[in-house]
Amino acid sequence: MESGNVVNAQPELSGIIDGSKSYVYEQLWKLCAGPLCDIPKLGEKVYYFPQGHIELVETSTREELNELQPICDLPSKLQCRVIAIHLKVENNSDETYAEITLMPDTTQVVIPTQNENQFRPLVNSFTKVLTASDTSAHGGFFVPKKHAIECLPSLDMSQPLPAQELLAIDLHGNQWRFNHNYRGTPQRHLLTTGWNAFTTSKKLVAGDVIVFVRGETGELRVGIRRARHQQGNIPSSIVSIDCMRHGVVASAKHAFDNQCMFTVVYKPRSSKFIVSYDKFLDAVNNKFNVGSRFTMRLEGDDFSERRCFGTIIGVSDFSPHWKCSEWRSLEVQWDEFTSFPGPKKVSPWDIEHLMPAINVPRSFLLKNKRLREVNEIGSSSSHLLPPILTQGQENEQLSVASPMNISLRYRDATEDAMNPSKLLMSYPVQPMPKLNYNNQMVTEMEENITTKTGTNFRLFGVTLDTPPVIKDPIEEIGSEISKLTEGKKFGLSQTLRSPTEIQNKQFSSSRTCTKVQMQGVTIGRAVDLSVLNGYDQLILELEKLFDIKGQLQTRNQWEIAFTDSDEDKMLVGDDPWPEFCNMVKKIFIQKRR
């Protein structure tokens, strides 16, 4: 932290990047920081939350945050201006962080006009999750064909063995040389000589992410993003325990008492304790209440952005020592258990409203929460909540799940059966049929038109019956809910689906079969990857399909390759099984050369 000196003159805004850093460096830093990185703008009015700053060093102190009492009388939030931002990287771990200089928002700070239309050079980049083959001592780094063409310098394909030397610079300014060639069977882009030295120096393992960025001038940059399990809360070389105890709060207090600047360390994966002034006001004006449905952006294990859904079940102070603070003031219940569970308490600016709040008793929400905690392991349909996106769906398209496609899942069959309307009141469900007519519903409506067989009247020999009675579609929905609830009593688990959902499911199911072609065999086969658990089962299944038992396991005579959507041909087994299933389009069994 900077020492607190009184600032009498107007401070100079030094900018987000100093003179020694290029625009390509900035883009590389952002890619290494991740999809959820939210750095404030230079000169922006923000709120600084000391609680969030303290949370950054929670692991270092090994104490619960609600036990950390303020050592001085400091408000829960402080209004500031962003004076300077410097994007940096930790020396030992290559973790990105930003040094942000703040100043109490006063008239002394003059913000220069920012040119929003400033020319930005074109930058090409790609990221890839490293496989075991990429990090092996005797292997190289496989670059997908599309990324090699767009991001790397062009190879001279007229040569028998196209090759070139690449010079890449990391965030520390260190230079790395790689031999880029196009070879192998099948041929593909590889980084060989120099790659092993890079992975060893950076201590890379399978699951880490490699980032390449290339500017218009040919400047090539390389960076890494470590897997979540390798990261700590804060680099020890930046902030110590004593600094957390006395420096974080004391320096902020000193800065506001003396109207001087102070600098904080801001990590992309930490909670947002520097929040845009406008974003904070929007979040507060939303008035999140108990029962409100929300969505929140979270980072998945594959470094992609996920949209998760939940319900607010409480509003209270996160710490008794910081009264009336908006920091993590919302207690939430997540819809589904995931491998990276979301926080139990969130801040209003971290989430987005799905729909207006519903007046739901807190006791009912807590009861359902306890029921889910008991049944969430081993039960896939134990609650009435919208599903999150699966990893495969995210790889194909990052999108927000519409609240109109929320599936019905039931918590307590006995209670719900006694009061089906409770389901419709407690959580958002499908709109009523009058808003969602389709062919299937219209057919059902027509079938529900019945004629009473009471007294018949004749007029000129024609029988006149009583008018037809049309059943209320709302009653029909309630009846369907009762039927499904009764089914669950006998161990059945069902889900209401619209015809569109059923059609989409049938379409996705038909895509699970992958075509397989074997050299020398005219007629191909098809294999269903969704029923297999790994490469070993795939090899056994292929041997059965072509009646070549034992010949594929030894790999002395045959080898297995596949093509992706870009028609790139690669060997089977170099990628994690889920990633392989997502990108494979066709499998080939060919003679080994």
Swiss-Prot record:
It comes from the Eukaryota. Coiled coil: none annotated. GO terms for molecular function: DNA-binding transcription factor activity; transcription cis-regulatory region binding. GO terms for cellular component: nucleus. Keywords: Auxin signaling pathway, DNA-binding, Nucleus, Transcription, Transcription regulation. InterPro entries: ARF_dom, ARF_plant, AUX/IAA_dom, B3_DNA-bd, DNA-bd_pseudobarrel_sf, PB1-like. It is found in: Nucleus. SUPFAM superfamilies: CAD & PB1 domains (SSF54277), DNA-binding pseudobarrel domain (SSF101936). Residues 126-228 bind DNA. Disulfide bonds: none annotated. Auxin response factors (ARFs) are transcriptional factors that bind specifically to the DNA sequence 5'-TGTCTC-3' found in the auxin-responsive promoter elements (AuxREs). Could act as transcriptional activator or repressor. Formation of heterodimers with Aux/IAA proteins may alter their ability to modulate early auxin response genes expression. Belongs to the ARF family. Pfam families: ARF_AD (PF06507), AUX_IAA (PF02309), B3 (PF02362). One of its GO terms (biological process) is auxin-activated signaling pathway. This is Auxin response factor 12. Homodimers and heterodimers. Interactions between auxin response factors (ARFs) and Aux/IAA proteins occur through their C-terminal dimerization domains III and IV. Residues 511-592 form the PB1 domain. It comes from Arabidopsis thaliana.
